[in-house]
Each structure stands twice: as structure tokens, then as C-alpha cells.
Amino acid sequence: MVMTRRIFFSWFIVICSLWLSSFSSVHAKLKGTISSADFNPIPIAITDFVSNDSIGLKIAAVVTADLERSGLFLPLDKASFFEKISNPNSQPHFFHWQKIRAQGLVTGQVIRENDGRLRVDFRLWDVFGHQQLKGRRFYTATERWRRVAHMIADEIYSEMTGESGYFDTRIVFIDETGPQNARIKRLAIMDQDGANLIYISDGSELVLTPRFSPKRQEITYMAYERNQPPHVYLQQIEMGQRELIGTFKNMTIAPRFSSDGQKVIMSLLQNNGSANLYTMDLRTRMMTRLTTTSAIDTSASYSPDGTQIVFSSDRSGKPQIYTMNADGSNLQRISANEGSYSTPIWSPRGDYIAFTKQLEGQFSIGVMRPDGKGERILTTGFHNEGPTWAPNGRVLMFFRKNPGMGPKIYTIDITGRNERQLPTPNDASDPAWSPLLNMQ
């Protein structure tokens, strides 16, 4: 039995520019300085947004939490502020903020319109350049205030680092409860900070490997019901509609969307025990075989431009990482060091491939360039697995099992800094990161 609850998300938000200055000294100074592991976070002062109720405090708190969690910003203690912002539309006294060494200053206000909507204004100031960097006005329904806060954090992140933000996103994952020998696994989705958790399935079937479309708020995943062959589904997140795209006699492994969202690539177990890669066209349902081998080919992922595929295969004796053209030609092994490699996934920027590596009883999350060079291990532990990229290619998410404990979800910066556990109500595994919601 599958939960039939429909999930509605109305994302309609109107955005206007308040005022945007020309190129600034802060942006010039900060861009290009955040790639090293010894980077010092940017000091930033985020004031409470002026409002007649608590909504302004809440929005400022979410913006602060987003930026602090990125590891690239150091939100300053409000107790240190010399100036109280009562009119966010006027220019601040920059010398007050220079005293506490803030490089950026965020001010804002929230007004309830006569039609019930919220009007949220924010401004980002260059403290030492004495000018405004960014100004935006948002109109939205009251219940969408958290999403507006994430969008503001994205604007600040982008302006002060030169990279795209990733806060206006969601995570789909497997929620796990119950004893280890009778685990209940439910499909769940939440905001990237752990808020707004919703269960998509009820635990009556085994669900595995949820993956987001790179183009839509849509996921694909596997489901196993008792005494039934494996099913592969598409699920529309906004409307809660689920569509069966395939029922397979043998085991199906790790379905994932192509870069244009028009196909799903998956590994199908053969009668001889091997597993080969296939694609399914989502419009015609036609299957195309890409690999023919007596080995196990699995965990395929497309390059951002859709021309190449990376996957894991044990055709050389133990699991290694291979790339090939999207039609299956030009096969190349790219992993060359000791250990077994699995779960490769291409960065949205195309510059790295993330992977899981097993060596000497430890599981690591690492990255390498698409030609296999420049391998770097970001974190190592008892059991780390299943990396997934933020849409800006800056942050990785994965799940970890510690001895005697259930799995939890973690994030880490591509430099290996800023490893953090993501709050979930229960054990959680197999996360997948959505594209930016405001790009849908």
C-alpha cells in the first residue's frame, strides 16, 4: 500500500530589484579567495528585519543560519552592534560597522500588504566600500517566508563569493526507523536545512536510491513490495503523482536522470549474474543497452552537458570508476589508486567527480577530476557513502554509519572543511540534492 497523500507546493514569489550598485570592493576582494582549506570566513553583520511581529526576526535567523552553515561566512554577534537599524531604506553609518570589522551588512524589513501577502525587502551593504551591493523586494504568501529567507541567503552568498548559492533547495532521502532486522524505510523530503519535512511513502514497501531530476521537482526511485518484482517510479513532488516507468524481472540498481531529464539510466541484473547499464527514454519507454559485460556495472551518472557517463564496475577485479561517451563508446578507467571505488557522481560544474572509496576497512568520500587526476579524500570514517552535490558544485552531502549506530546525513565543503551533520528526526540515508527551486 502506497501513501496517496498529495503534496502541493505553490512557489509563486514576485521579486523586484530595489537598487543594484556597480562592481564593488568587497566582491573584488572576496572572489577567488574561498578555494583553499585555510580560508577565513567572511565577517558579516545581519540585523533583525524590521517588522510589526516576529516574522522579521525569523527571516533574519534563517538567513544567518544558512550563511553560517556554509562555512564561508562568520555572522557577527548582535550584542556587538553599535547601530540599531530602524529604517532599512536609509544608508547606515558605516563607521559603526567598521568598528566590529564587518565586511558586509544586511538590513531588511517585512510589511504585510492589504491583500495578506508579505513584502520582504533586503539590502546588502559593502561596509568598507560605503555602498550598496544588492537590493531585492519579494512578494509572497505568509507561509512561504522560509523560502524567501533562503533566497535572500542565496543572493548574499552569490554577491559576496562570486559563486551561485544553494540554500533554496530540497533534499530527498530515506528515513529509517525500527530494529536493524526489521527496518522501516520511508521516502522523505525536506528543505536543505532540515525544515519542512514531508513523508512521501508510508513504509509499506522498501524504497531505495531516490534521485532528483536536474530540470524539474521530480524524483525517480526503486520500490520493492513483498513477492513482487522491483519497480522503478517517477514521482512529481508538487502534485504527489507517482508514475510507474518500469517493472523488471531481475534486480534494478540505482536509477538516475540524464542531464536533460529526458532519460533514466539504470543497472539491470542479467540472468548470468552480471549487471549492465541501460537507458530508458521517458517519453517512448524505449530501452537502450549501453554496456555488455560479465561484470557488475552500476551507479551511473551523466556529465552536466550529457555527453559522458561515469559509473562503477568490477570488470578489472574490484570496483573502479570508468567513464564513457553517452552512447557507450570510448570506455576509460579513471581511478588508479589503491582501494575500491563506488557511487561516482559528476559535479554540476563538470570539474569533479565525487565517489566513495573503501580501503583498509575505512570508507572515504573523495573527489577527482574527470580524467582521474587530482584525487583528494575529503573525509574518512567507519562507513561513509553516497555523495550528492549541491547545485553549485561547492558542497557535498553523504550519509555515515558509526559503529553501533544508525545512518545520519552530513555535508562537507569541497575543500574538506566544514563537515556538519544535517538534522533529521530519525536515522537517514541515501540523500539526493535538488536543483535550485528558483530555477525551475
Swiss-Prot record:
Gene Ontology CC annotations of this record: periplasmic space
Where it mainly occurs, coarsely classed, is periplasm
List residues traversing the bilayer: none
Mind telling me which SUPFAM superfamilies this protein's record contains? TolB, N-terminal domain, Tricorn protease N-terminal domain
- InterPro entries, alphabetized: 6-blade_b-propeller_TolB-like, PD40, Tol-Pal_TolB, TolB_N
Keyword set for this entry? Cell cycle, Cell division, Periplasm, Signal
UniProt entry tagged with the keyword Aminoacyl-tRNA synthetase = no
Task: Name where it's found.
Answer: Periplasm
Q: Name one GO biological process term.
A: cell division
**Signal peptide span:** 1-28
Q: List the disulfide bonds.
A: none
User: Residues annotated as region Disordered?
Assistant: 417-440
**Family, per entry:** Belongs to the TolB family.
Per the entry, what this protein does is:
Part of the Tol-Pal system, which plays a role in outer membrane invagination during cell division and is important for maintaining outer membrane integrity.
Give the multimer and partner information.
Answer: The Tol-Pal system is composed of five core proteins: the inner membrane proteins TolA, TolQ and TolR, the periplasmic protein TolB and the outer membrane protein Pal. They form a network linking the inner and outer membranes and the peptidoglycan layer.
Q: What is this protein called?
A: Tol-Pal system protein TolB
Q: What is the species listed in this Swiss-Prot or TrEMBL entry? A: Bartonella quintana (strain Toulouse)
- Show the taxonomic lineage: Bacteria, Pseudomonadati, Pseudomonadota, Alphaproteobacteria, Hyphomicrobiales
